[in-house]
């Protein structure tokens, strides 16, 4: 966990022209001691550098994708999943739009489309995904990337119905975000 990078990122922070940190001096290279023997140098790679580069590539694209949380159903689960999803997607520099909750999938999709969302994340409980996920996918009709927050027991059924995107604690955050950037036409 990299606090402020892949956990609790600042949703509104911009790089303001900063570039990814490059390896400098001899760190990571080869150095010799006074007797001309090779000395192993320290690697100065920063753990956050790949996340920073991803966020910068999103910024440089000139497009700041909007990720809309379609929160519905069980209050505790939808809030927890929305918080997780906001943190997950903000790592790539996406604008995240959280919501208190919707009475129906149709209402949530309508609001997502009004907001011009590029990504819509369904946030609910595992038990409710069987009821809400497929109608949400159909209502979106490919007008945004559709994601289910979590790894519900009905995941195989949802995949069979055409739902491809799931984010959860076992996902590789960096690889998943790179995949979404690619789908959004954002180059590395």
Name each model-derived stretch.
Residues 58-71, 134-146, 181:
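Long, low-complexity, intrinsically disordered polar/charged segments
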Residues 74-79, 128-131, 154-156:
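Flexible loop/turn segments at secondary-structure boundaries
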Residues 105, 128-137, 176:
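Active-site-adjacent beta->alpha loops and helix N-cap segments on the catalytic face
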């Amino acid at each position: 966990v990299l606090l402020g990078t892949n956990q609790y990122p600042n949703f509104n922070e911009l790089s303001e022209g900063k570039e990814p940190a490059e390896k400098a001096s001899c760190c990571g290279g080869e150095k010799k001691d006074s007797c001309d023997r090779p000395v192993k140098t320290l690697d100065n790679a920063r753990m956050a550098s790949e996340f920073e580069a991803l966020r910068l590539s999103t910024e440089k694209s000139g497009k700041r994708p909007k990720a809309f949380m379609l929160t519905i159903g069980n209050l505790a689960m939808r809030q927890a999943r929305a918080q997780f999803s906001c943190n997950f997607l903000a790592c790539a520099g996406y604008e995240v739009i959280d919501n208190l909750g919707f009475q129906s999938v149709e209402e949530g999709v309508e609001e997502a489309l009004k907001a011009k969302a590029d990504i819509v994340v369904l946030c609910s409980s595992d038990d409710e995904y069987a009821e809400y996920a497929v109608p949400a996918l159909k209502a979106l009709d490919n007008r945004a990337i559709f994601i289910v927050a979590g790894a519900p027991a009905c995941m195989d059924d949802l995949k069979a119905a055409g739902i491809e995107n799931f984010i959860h604690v076992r996902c590789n955050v960096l690889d998943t975000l790179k995949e979404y950037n690619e789908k959004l036409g954002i180059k590395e």
